[in-house]
Amino acid sequence: MFIENFKVESPNVKYTDHEIHSVYDYETTELVHENRNGTYQWIVKPKTVKYEFKTDVHVPKLGVMLVGWGGNNGSTLTGGVIANREGICWATKDTVQQANYFGSLTQASAIRVGSYNGEEIYAPFKSILPMVNPDDIVFGGWDISDMNLADAMARARVFDIDLQKQLRPYMESMVPLPGIYDPDFIAANQGSRANNVIKGTKKEQMLQIIKDIREFKEKNKVDRVVVLWTANTERYSNVIVGLNDTVESLLASLDKNEAEISPSTLYAIACVLENIPFINGSPQNTFVPGLIDLAIRRNCLIGGDDFKSGQTKMKSVLVDFLVGAGIKPTSIVSYNHLGNNDGMNLSAPQTFRSKEISKSNVVDDMVSSNVFFMGLVNTRPRWIKYVPYVAIERAMDEYTSEIFMGGKSTIVLHNTCEDSLLAAPIILDLVLLAELSTRIQLKAEGEGKFHSFHPVATILSYLTKAPLVPPGTPVVNALSKQRAMLENILRACVGLAPENNMILEYK
């Protein structure tokens, strides 16, 4: 059974006109390795920590600025939100299609809230806490191409022609602001698009981004802005002592116009200085150590890296299943070919390397959770090939595992990925959850004052391929754990226990 919304009635939660306040007992464990009767033993001690959460219920008018707004993802997301807002239907060769948000965690998934008369009751994910309605988002952004969004949508060839025709009047007037272009960081084949670029030194470019954000906010009368990178994958930046390893060195390098500061890092610096949440949707190392330190000092949300949309999402599910079932993965071989602009940019070795690194650690935490399998998975080789005729990505994976008594099992997956149709709802979720997390404050027992989440937003890790985490924090890639973490944190904000699936009342 499905219900549209709900309200929690409990001594641990209080709703007011301004906030939701909850008290939550966080049940965890503490491990100690100590001498007991002459031998060292691992002792697990259950531990309860009392937390308080308060969530601002005022939903702001949200502006979303996309870096690479005129790319496939940017034009697809913008058109998709307009189609949903306007209730557009269009004809395909098979049917009359209605706009939807399938693929969005916040807009198209559900959570279990309990049972009623022996039936499981579910509610929309977006009903847990007040969230921005996608229909109300104001879009803007930058692109190194000056093509308007209607023409960019046609160039992307993602939407059906009938839908494009209906969207064109809404999107023709949308033109990206000039973007930062540095040919040293992306493939040379992108140069033909670069007719809309910000001139000047790197610091001047960064200051122009700040000016653009302020003008966008003022022009559109938005309360809050979130910036997200959905532009080309850059090559990895060199992390060098004295260049970008500390806040001071990074800002000094900016003053000196050091060549090794990437465009994505310039956008991120601008956002952090303006206290604007910034999310990196590509695999490069935008968040060099000095930038992470700057975000922490200024308590500005940053998140990334790389959208987890198709092939990698499947991998984070399948390997979790294999390891959890006691099956020993021994080899994962992956191959992609695609013909869109993403594939063309990734055809350059230096940008491909960023994607390779992003994909390389996806299974590490799952394999290391089982002592029998540690260090046994070979996840190479992997290839990404640019095939112009094939617009839609094809992903092929072969998983080889060892099973009972020396047997071998092979699983082969072929995944045809509509990349931008998978990525667009993920972008939507990222900006909505980033905005929501800025309205949540918490404090643990013994802490005097409420504070926000850590600026490095692990709460977004379900949506990213290589989750950015605070220093010293374990990286979790298993999709089910990431989903449970996100849902259970939001449940805690309304005083609900985590969903543990025990269902003891029926045992």
UniProtKB/Swiss-Prot annotation:
Q: What processes in GO biological process is this protein linked to?
A: inositol biosynthetic process; phospholipid biosynthetic process
Q: Name one GO molecular function term.
A: inositol-3-phosphate synthase activity
Q: Which UniProt keywords apply?
A: Cytoplasm, Inositol biosynthesis, Isomerase, Lipid biosynthesis, Lipid metabolism, NAD, Nucleus, Phospholipid biosynthesis, Phospholipid metabolism
Positions contributing to NAD(+) binding:
70-73, 143, 180, 190, 193, 230-233, 281-282, 306, 309, 340-342, 355, 391, 419-420
This protein's source sits in the domain of life called: Eukaryota
The residues forming a coiled coil are: none
GO cellular component terms given for this protein: cytosol; nucleus
Q: Which cofactor does it need?
A: NAD(+)
Query: Pathway it acts in?
Result: Polyol metabolism; myo-inositol biosynthesis; myo-inositol from D-glucose 6-phosphate: step 1/2
Q: Main site of residence?
A: cytoplasm
| Role summary | Key enzyme in myo-inositol biosynthesis pathway that catalyzes the conversion of glucose 6-phosphate to 1-myo-inositol 1-phosphate in a NAD-dependent manner.
Q: What is this protein called?
A: Inositol-3-phosphate synthase
**What species does this protein belong to?**
Citrus paradisi (Grapefruit)
The organism that produces this protein has a lineage beginning with: Eukaryota, Viridiplantae, Streptophyta, Embryophyta, Tracheophyta
